Amino acid sequence: MKCVEVYKELYHQEPFDVAFCPYRISPLGAHIDHQYGKINGLAIDKGIHMAYHPKQNGVVELQSLNFPKRAQFFVSAVPDEKQGDWADHLRGAAKMLGEKYRLKVGLSGIIEGSLPIGGLSSSASVIICFLSALCKVNGIHLEPMEMILTAKAAENQYVGVSCGKLDQSCEVLSKKNHLLYLDTKDDSYELIPTSEKMKPYKVAIFFSGLERSLKNSKYNLRQDECKAAAYALMGYAGMDYDTFANTRLRDVPFEVFEAYKERLPELWRRRAEHYYSEFARAEKGAELWRKGDLEGYGQLVFESGKSSIYSYECGCDELKKLYEIMTDTDGIYGGRFSGAGFKGRCMALIDPDKAEDIEVKVTTEYLKAFPALNGKYSFHFCESADGVEL
């Protein structure tokens, strides 16, 4: 790992340890975790590594191999306001952890992401990787749900991204060769083993060549549109409702949506249509995975991608082109945008025997459409993996 070599060169010592947090994919359940929907997810064998060593003076000193500028702050005196750089995720993590535990020991470290930024929950991976190291040097043990909620709070309350808990849950709870089936309303989950009847598969990652940050996207706006739809539907139906901030589409039965959907503004109706259809796909997908029906599962993933484009209305021209190519490529069982879907990448479940042909076809057609991205676009094969070690 390059982070280890850079650490040794910079600090003239071996790192104390190397923390790792996997990236994740979510084939089904896209854009509904923040509405307390159900999701399907997998951790993959690519992610964030951090070579580090404790600092007894309480200073956190971190450098990223993916971003400029070294981060430095006292673990017990994190700035109250974000600084607007990549290290806000680290400051937020320390801030949230420090609200529950006394932090005395800092650390020096080098952080390295194994894939380009965007669409694989890299921000959540950075936070969880850092939290696991910070906990270790301070003698703190977090249970899985506590790690998930601490990492989520760092993004929500400090970075300013209104994410749900899909990313963190996949990265913490996942198990190799299993599908995580999670209800984000009550945090109940099931790890569904890959059936012996299921055909072999690999995860393919198509990086568009465009990196993105949720802070400047329409990610938060889409959530507000979902909440607005829920709030209006509850009002039309005469239901009891809470504040706008505490309202979710999960609070609204599908029958209420069907009865009053024509009264919603078109954009709000589309967002709600995506929520209800994606919720159903996540439920059906779990059953198909249990049965080993990879073709049927893949078709649901393609349907999810279509709904993200036309009902949730995310995606840029480049991601839409990748999706279009995937739907017409032999050997791809199913694919869609990965992550928020405003830039970043697409993911697919593929037939391993056709991996080389898939790589050639997708790459050729994509770069024919966007030649300026030659050298930035990339293709990666991954396997399912265990979640972070706590």
How does the language model describe each region?
Residues N40-A43, A51-P54, Y101:
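Short, charge-rich binding segments
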Residues Y36-A43, R222-Q223:
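Short Gly/aromatic-enriched secondary-structure transition segments
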Residues S125-I127, R345-I350:
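FabD-like malonyl-/acyl-CoA
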Residues M1-L28, H49-Q83, H178-G334, L349-L390:
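C-terminal nucleotide
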Residues F342:
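Glycine-rich phosphate-binding loop
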Residues M1-A19, I25-K38, F74-A77, Q83-S195, ...:
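Gly/Ser-rich oxyanion-binding loop with an adjacent helix/lid
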